[in-house]
A protein has these predicted regions:
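N-terminal beta1-alpha1 ligand-phosphate binding loop
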Residues: 25-44, 207
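Short, surface-exposed beta-strand/loop micro-motifs that present aromatic residues
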Residues: 188-195
Length: 225
């Protein structure tokens, strides 16, 4: 169910509320919501480094793959940065990684939106959201997260777990056990959060999701080693 009355928010929070500072690498490949993600994390006290090549990430404690746009152009841009192998090695080494929106979808093997292969880090595919009567398409607006397994990002019974979505495609992993939360879309359940060891990915935009987005980012930052 979409909730349209909550005002749109981008996180601008007090730095003093978060005393643990990290260097976070934000992958800049020409498809990301770089500005709003940067401002959100800086307001939480984090140092953000824009990553365009491998050497720039050597001092980072975590990497973020943001994304707004289409699957194939995003994969082409990533290929042109020579970062694909580095992203795969980063995740396989156990370092913290966060994918946001299109950044989640690129982690999969393929997408209905394009013909190119994805990163293939997560087994499964990205499917077109089905047309359902009385449901908005594309899926744009606020939805309440449903916890599907115990995880470090949301807690069962928490109030106001509403987050902001803008997407036309949704993730269908082969292993449903990595889905940490979903949202209702008519009779369908759409993947909202994937958590698998050091790999975290969300279909919604935490940087545009008010207090719930703040909580999500804080808990992820707390888990960074």
């Amino acid at each position: 169910m979409l909730f349209q009355k909550q005002p749109f928010q981008v996180l601008y929070l007090s730095i003093c509320e978060n005393k643990t500072l990290h260097k976070i690498g934000l992958i800049d490949y020409g498809m990301g919501n770089i500005h709003s993600v940067t401002k959100s994390l800086e307001s939480l006290g984090e140092e953000i480094l824009l990553i365009k090549n491998i050497d720039q990430s050597k001092d980072c404690k975590a990497l973020i793959l943001p994304g707004v746009g289409s699957f194939d152009p995003a994969m082409i841009n990533l290929r042109d940065t020579d970062l694909i192998i580095h992203i795969k090695n980063w995740i396989s080494s156990g370092k913290s990684f966060l994918g946001i929106c299109l950044g989640l979808q690129l982690l999969f093997e393929s997408s209905d939106e394009g013909s190119l292969s994805g990163l293939g880090i997560i087994k499964g595919e990205i499917k077109k959201i089905p047309k359902i009567f009385d449901q908005r398409s594309p899926h744009v607006g606020w939805c309440k997260l449903n916890q599907t397994k115990k995880n470090t990002l949301i807690k069962e019974g928490e109030l106001n777990n509403w987050v902001y979505f803008v997407h036309s495609y949704h993730a269908v992993p082969n292993d449903s056990n990595i889905i940490a939360a979903n949202v209702d879309y008519g009779y369908e359940k759409l993947t909202a959060i994937i958590e698998n060891d050091n790999l975290l990915a969300c279909q919604f935009h935490p940087e545009k999701s008010g207090k719930t987005g703040e909580k999500f980012l804080r808990r992820w930052l707390k888990n960074i080693q």
